Amino acid sequence: MKSSPFASDCTPLIKLFLQYKLTLALAESCTCGLVAAQLAPTEGISDVLLGSVVTYHALAKQKLLGVSAETIELYSAESQQTTNEMAMGLHRHLPEADVCVAVTGLCGPGPSATPDKPVGTVFVTIFIDKHAHEYRTQFKGDANSMRQQAADFIYQQLTELLTRLQPMVKPEKP
């Protein structure tokens, strides 16, 4: 696994959120709260992070975020469709969040793994400015390594997205 600038320091990312006066909410499955935990020590986080919900099991995804049983049955709990519903459900429950991030994936063997979706497949949805940005990626290593890679991937995508969309997001107030 290559070294990441994010695992130990999320300051540049949080500075972007602060600069644009944006808030963040997370729905984490395969990362088990790691994304929020690594953001927590960052200066300014209390002005950015509204909360994080860990919805590891399909039942939690359904009960806490409103993911439909049909989506899970058709596509599995670890799919882009489920991740999208997680992000949208999070936004429905917490509309004050400017950015909603959801993550699911396979960091270990299980019944959802297939040749088309092997262990290491991770799905991320970032909902911002009424648009869902979907990502599917693949990681290698043990479960903890894959969780860290997924967290780093989320930090990287958020940084790139906020930088790219800066004219669309809330301007800094004087």
Annotate the PLM regions.
Residues 1-174:
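Short alpha-helical segments enriched in small residues
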